[in-house]
């Protein structure tokens, strides 16, 4: 399988940089996978779990939004937050979700819709992290 260069950058750090076989991205308009030779594209990333495959190794990274750009040079993801899944504190993540739930009643209209959508994404991440932690 052909490889391509992938960089994952957040304001705090370069979370990943190297050659990979595939990257699966939680896109705002649907999840998508990138392989070598992918057509150029710029996409918005929603909160979710990004999966990097390099040979037999798979690495899951929690991203909380950002932008992905595929070019002839490879894939660059500029993430608002990027944390390797094993490094996520599940109790802190659950507390964040609880705070988000408590803030829902004070929102209306589009703000309410966005808050519910973001909460749903966080709950999906939590479910996958809890499922992965059990295996």
Curated annotation (Swiss-Prot):
Its main location: membrane. GO terms for molecular function: ATP binding; proton-transporting ATP synthase activity, rotational mechanism. Keywords: ATP synthesis, Cell inner membrane, Cell membrane, CF(1), Hydrogen ion transport, Ion transport, Membrane, Transport. Signal peptide: none annotated. Coiled coil: none annotated. It comes from the Bacteria. PANTHER family: ATP SYNTHASE DELTA/EPSILON CHAIN, ATP SYNTHASE EPSILON CHAIN, CHLOROPLASTIC. F-type ATPases have 2 components, CF(1) - the catalytic core - and CF(0) - the membrane proton channel. CF(1) has five subunits: alpha(3), beta(3), gamma(1), delta(1), epsilon(1). CF(0) has three main subunits: a, b and c. Produces ATP from ADP in the presence of a proton gradient across the membrane. This is ATP synthase epsilon chain. It comes from Rhodopseudomonas palustris (strain TIE-1). The gene is atpC.
């Amino acid at each position: 399988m052909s490889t391509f260069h992938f960089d994952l950058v957040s304001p705090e750090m370069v979370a990943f940089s190297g050659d990979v076989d595939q990257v699966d991205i939680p896109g705002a308009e649907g999840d998508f996978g990138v392989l070598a030779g992918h057509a150029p594209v710029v996409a918005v990333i929603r909160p979710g779990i990004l999966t990097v495959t390099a040979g037999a190794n798979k690495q899951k990274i929690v991203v909380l939004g950002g932008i992905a750009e595929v070019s002839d040079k490879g894939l660059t993801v500029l993430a608002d937050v990027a944390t390797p899944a094993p490094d996520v504190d599940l109790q802190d993540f659950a507390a964040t979700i609880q705070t988000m739930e408590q803030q829902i009643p004070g929102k209306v209209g589009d703000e309410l819709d966005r808050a519910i959508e973001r909460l749903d994404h966080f709950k999906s991440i939590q479910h996958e992290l809890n499922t992965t932690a059990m295996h």
